[in-house]
Amino acid sequence: MELSQQRVLVTGATSGIGEDIAQAFAQAGAQVKGTGATAAEVDRASAANAHLSIHFHPLDVGDASAVHSFVTGLGELDVVVNCAGVIQRQVELEPEAFAKTIDINLNGTMRACAAAREGLKARRGCIVNTASMLSFFGGGLTPGYSASKGGVAQLTKSLAIAYATDGIRVNAVAPGWIATPLTRALQNDPTRSAQIVGRTPMGRWGQPEDVADPVLFLASPAARFVTGVVLPVDGGYLIQ
């Protein structure tokens, strides 16, 4: 897919799905700005992706003023992909951790969308958010993550309506079980991994590139009449 000269922002771009998405845009010819939560993450990603046109910057999406300053400072944008997020299994049952997860995953997404609106309007751009299979069902050990991703799904639909008058499309992907650092413990648990693969009609774990390609589609002219969609990318896990 050719996206030459597209101006793209990917938050949470220093690892996992976000890093693959940033790489995919750069390989398609886009000019990519990627963010990471810490300077160490940014340094690692910068070194690993030195051969690509991706410029990484530290950004805490929980800091409203920092998000506004950074995103508005980018000027006009064609695409914003919100991947920044956290998950704190078991700990999210405590109110403080629950609130932090909501703030990063849901409020952080809204902060980036709001800050980017004028820049996207200038180029009739689009937003792709990162929801989850847990947008559709509960997680007993991850109430904050599940609630935040359910919120991202509804935020996506709501902003698709609100931003349509500006010519901005807003969609989301909802990844299933993807092989990333966040799921490494489950991948390394033979019993649990077998259960996941057994329920997935496609019969395997997803890879980050399996998510990156649908994101590129949603951001491309091929999806010019697509907005408000929360697209499962889960190998069929949700239909079982």
Say what each PLM segment does.
Residues 137, 215-216, 227-240:
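Short C-terminal tail/terminal secondary-structure segment
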Residues 164, 169, 226-228:
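Short, small/polar-rich loop/turn modules that mediate ligand/substrate recognition or access, typified
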Residues 89-102, 196:
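Substrate-binding pocket helix/loop in short-chain dehydrogenase/reductase
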Residues 14-15:
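Conserved glycine-rich cofactor-binding loop
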Residues 28-44:
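Conserved glycine-rich Rossmann-like NAD(P)H-binding loop of the short-chain dehydrogenase/reductase
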Residues 102, 113, 148, 156:
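Active-site helix of classical SDR
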Residues 132:
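Residue(s) in the substrate-gating loop at a strand-loop-helix junction
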